[in-house]
Amino acid sequence: TFLSLFYEKGWSSLEREVALDELNNEFIRQLDLLIELLEIYLSYLDYLDFEVRGIETSSTALDAISHLSNSSVLNFNYTNTSSHLFGTFEEKTHFIHGRIDLDRTFNRINTMVFGIEDKENDVNSDLVPYQKYYQRVVKETGIKFEMFFLSSYFVEYLHVQGTEKSFPHDSKAAKNIIIFGHSVDPLDKEIFQKSFALAEEGGYPYRFIFTYFDESAKRSIIKNLAIILGKEKLIELTGTQNVVFVKSDDKIGMEKVLLP
């Protein structure tokens, strides 16, 4: 508690503002320690799950996706679970909140982001070290995921009417953006807002497919999307089928909504 630290650290001789600064610094040190302990704990669980128990994937809606292992992955977790279960490639994965890495050397930082939401446009200097955006900057988790939204092309042949001729034409490939196992918590609103903006700017057909466990989870996701995007925007996107919802174990439902 503050009172015990107040006497233990000898802050009683300091001015009030200085003592509060010292307390804040102590909180930051404790947060760093908590993140280190969380990394050790998650590394242990990761080892148990995949090295000891040998957990394998069960049947899900993701089974409808061909070449799933070649997908680009925006990972909100600290562990590389998608690689273990679906064979995705690390070079095509962005750990937006950092990742566990017990093998890193002492001169490399812990990249795990573990903070609170930044709800205000104005920067509150007292809360900055605890906020996710600040930690993402300091820990350099980057914006690699934005590359996932760049246009990709395929060649199609257009037939010239009235002739037997056709000529090649570069067309933009559609993108299916599948959100699996995420509550769409507004804590990550800036990432979702950026993803929607990039998809709209891309000029290609796109669809955000949100998977849900049950009806309660679906309602929660819709509520969170309304907070992140605004009610009118969400209504617009669902009306144009740019946003759809599929139960997480519904392979047939996923097949129906995937853009070709």
Identify the meaning behind each predicted range:
Residues T163-P260:
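SIR2/sirtuin-family catalytic core signature
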